[in-house]
Amino acid sequence: MEQLTARQTEVLQIITRHLETCGYPPTLREIAAQLGISGTLGVMKHLEALEKKGYLRRQEGSTRGITLCNQSQAASLPIVGVVRAGLLHPAIQDIEGHFAIDRSQLASGGAFFLRVKGDSMVHAHIVEGDLALVRPQPHASNRDIVVAMVDGEATLKRFYREADRIRLQPENPNYEPIIIEKGEQEVSIVGKVVGIYRQME
């Protein structure tokens, strides 16, 4: 399939979410409302482009005549709160939206996205505003990039286990590593970062 523009991706996500939550596709006006536009002409152009690229089929004369191609291959994952790539940040919570990806990219259930804030992981090519795809798991191997909870606060860092301590290493020399000595602080692994998604302007 051809690559989508950012706006076409947004339209496809709106349709996918509506199908998953309501069981039927949205109308043109419902799509327009979620895009923040008043008319439906722009929506029709996006749908036409999506149809030409093979992402959906339209049924003329029906207000909800949209069918996704390979619908079973799409997965709409929650974007959960914010994780700060830098300083520690209050615990992960709150769903701020959803983002659709190909189901083949998921090795297991329960995956979710976290939106990155801060610049402590820039040398790992993770920047502010990125969506980090997190696979929930309670353990990590050395050099894994993880979302970790330290004393109830979440951070995104590279994981190292060293003798009697854990080191959460930033990928930016302007930041110090977080060192957790055995028994000093409570630390748990929320999950491993298995992908980064970025919207291009």
Curated annotation (Swiss-Prot):
Keywords: Autocatalytic cleavage, DNA damage, DNA repair, DNA replication, DNA-binding, Hydrolase, Repressor, SOS response, Transcription, Transcription regulation
Residue positions of the active site: 120 (for autocatalytic cleavage activity), 157 (for autocatalytic cleavage activity)
EC nos: 3.4.21.88
Binding partners and assembly: Homodimer.
GO biological process, one term: negative regulation of DNA-templated transcription
Similarity remark: Belongs to the peptidase S24 family.
Organism: Citrifermentans bemidjiense (strain ATCC BAA-1014 / DSM 16622 / JCM 12645 / Bem) (Geobacter bemidjiensis)
Catalytic activity as recorded in UniProt: Hydrolysis of Ala-|-Gly bond in repressor LexA
Site feature location: Cleavage: 85-86
Record function comment: Represses a number of genes involved in the response to DNA damage (SOS response), including recA and lexA. In the presence of single-stranded DNA, RecA interacts with LexA causing an autocatalytic cleavage which disrupts the DNA-binding part of LexA, leading to derepression of the SOS regulon and eventually DNA repair.
Enzyme class, spelled out: hydrolase
Gene Ontology MF, one: serine-type endopeptidase activity
Protein name as annotated: LexA repressor
Gene that encodes the chain: lexA
Gene3D superfamilies, A to Z: Umud Fragment, subunit A, Winged helix-like DNA-binding domain superfamily/Winged helix DNA-binding domain
DNA-binding region ranges: 28-48
Superkingdom in the source lineage: Bacteria
